[in-house]
Every structure is written in C-alpha cells, then in structure tokens.
Amino acid sequence: MIKNAFISFQEKKEESKGSVEFQVFSFTNKIRRLTSHLELHRKDYLSQRGLRKILGKRQRLLAYLSKKNRVRYKELIKQLNIRELKTR
C-alpha cells in the first residue's frame, strides 16, 4: 500500500511520526478512506462531520508548512497529489 512506501521514505529521512509531513499523509489517507465510504453511504452524517474536521486539520497543517518551509510544502503536495491551498 502507499502508506508503507511513504513510511519507508520517511524512515530514510529519519523523521519521526510527529513530523508535519507524516501527519498530513495520515490525514490524507483517512480522507481518502472516508470519501470512498461516503460514496456508498451518502446519509452517514457523522462520517461527513468527521471528514470535515480532518480536512480542516490537514488544511491548518499545510498552511503551517507553507509558511515555514515552502520547498517541503511543494514536494509534499506533489507527492500526495493534492491541490495547493487557496490564498486570500
């Protein structure tokens, strides 16, 4: 699975599971799982709420990473195949 490949990639860089990149990756996996679940169960409102909460957490982490280190942010966005944050 993708997660195992990413974990080995992270271990090569000797970063902990508490790193921003790993947290964003974990949230992205949860988001993809919940999205596929909600395609089957459209009226599962608790899962919809959980999805919105996880999306918010990931968005805040990405905003933090974007401010702190733009290069790592760009690499992560490209690697996870997600869109960039909207800027105001």
Curated annotation (Swiss-Prot):
PROSITE patterns: RIBOSOMAL_S15. Pfam families: Ribosomal_S15. InterPro entries: Ribosomal_uS15, Ribosomal_uS15_bac-type, uS15_NS1_RNA-bd_sf. It comes from Lobularia maritima (Sweet alyssum). One of its GO terms (biological process) is translation. CDD domains: Ribosomal_S15p_S13e. Part of the 30S ribosomal subunit. The keyword Nucleotide-binding does not apply. Keywords: Chloroplast, Plastid, Ribonucleoprotein, Ribosomal protein. SMART domains: Ribosomal_S15. GO terms for molecular function: structural constituent of ribosome. The gene is rps15. It is found in: Plastid, Chloroplast. PANTHER family: RIBOSOMAL PROTEIN S15, BACTERIAL AND ORGANELLAR, SMALL RIBOSOMAL SUBUNIT PROTEIN US15M. Signal peptide: none annotated. GO terms for cellular component: chloroplast; ribonucleoprotein complex; ribosome. Gene3D superfamilies: S15/NS1, RNA-binding. Belongs to the universal ribosomal protein uS15 family. This is Small ribosomal subunit protein uS15c. SUPFAM superfamilies: S15/NS1 RNA-binding domain.
